[in-house]
A protein has these predicted regions:
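N-terminal-proximal low-complexity accessory segments that begin disordered
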Residues: 1-25, 29-42, 50
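Catalytic alpha/beta active-site cores
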Residues: 33, 37-274
């Protein structure tokens, strides 16, 4: 109540001042002095930190893109939530990052090789190795609670900063399936698959590099869409429930084929200490 009264008082003072000075040439300094006089502008206080507890790090700590989508559109909502992770290989291949766009819808082997070179150069900056580069690696193994990068069968190295290793996934034969790195609280997933079309042609069998992308999403009910009547609200809450339970899906026609979109599965990894 006190804050509302203060707000009303300041608004009335602003209205009266603007009426009184209507048509006059007013300097920025005059305006600033008046705003300070009525308490609209106050002196900067000491540095402080927000102390709200139990807030997910994606909201409180991690700096990254945030998407806004209408909750009433299940397909858009799923796209936004799934955009937490995005393929760097796909992003570089399908855009003009390399200087030009793809010339056709068919896979271009030479362009693909340039994409791999570009991405490994990115890894050299994101998670540099000791005394070598990512394009020299022929194998990545988990040995004695460490991630070892092999240059040859008898020569190996590690990351310059091994604290960048968030964790990994193993195949049933104990070879690495996925290596998860991080920098500035954002993660990078290096996928390894010797049977993948890209992976089998790569020295280290790296099939893709996935970057943490849209860290969070606003599922919007009132700006990009207006859920005001009962029918719209039922759709909104049904989609929200589907996201919370993990069973939301959307079917649509693409290239004359029915496509179904669902939530990506959670990612489970092992840390170096198990």
């Amino acid at each position: 109540k006190l804050l509302l009264d203060k707000r009303h008082k300041i608004q009335s003072q602003l209205d009266n001042w603007n009426k009184k000075n209507k048509g006059k040439e007013i300097s920025i300094q005059d305006q600033k002095e008046y705003l300070q006089e009525i308490g609209y502008i106050v002196k900067e206080g000491e540095d402080f930190k927000i102390k709200t507890t139990n807030v997910d790090p994606e909201i409180a700590l991690v700096c990254g893109p945030q998407l806004v989508v209408p909750i009433t559109n299940a397909r858009y909502a799923l796209n936004a939530v799934n955009a937490r992770w995005g393929s760097l290989y796909d992003a570089v291949y399908g855009t003009d990052v390399l200087g030009s766009l793809p010339e056709s819808n068919q896979y271009d082997q030479k362009r693909g090789e340039k994409v791999v070179d570009f991405v490994k150069s990115h890894l050299d900056v994101f998670a540099p190795l000791k005394d070598t580069n990512w394009d020299q690696i022929v194998d990545i193994r988990y040995e004695n609670n460490k991630i070892i990068f092999y240059i040859t069968q008898n020569s190996s190295t590690t990351l310059q900063n091994e604290n960048q290793i968030a964790g990994f996934q193993l195949n049933t034969n104990k070879t690495i399936k996925e290596l998860v790195l991080f920098k500035n609280n954002l993660h990078c997933r290096v996928l390894i698959d010797p049977n993948h079309p890209i992976g089998k042609g790569d020295l280290a069998n790296i099939s893709d590099v996935i970057l943490e992308s849209a860290v969070s999403s606003i599922l919007d009910c009132e700006d990009s869409v207006a859920t005001v009547d009962a029918e719209d609200k039922v759709i909104a809450y049904r989609n929200w429930l589907g996201l919370m339970t993990g069973n939301l899906e959307a079917k649509f026609i693409k290239n004359k084929q029915t496509t179904k979109r669902v939530l990506n599965k959670d990612i489970e990894i092992l840390t170096l200490n198990g």
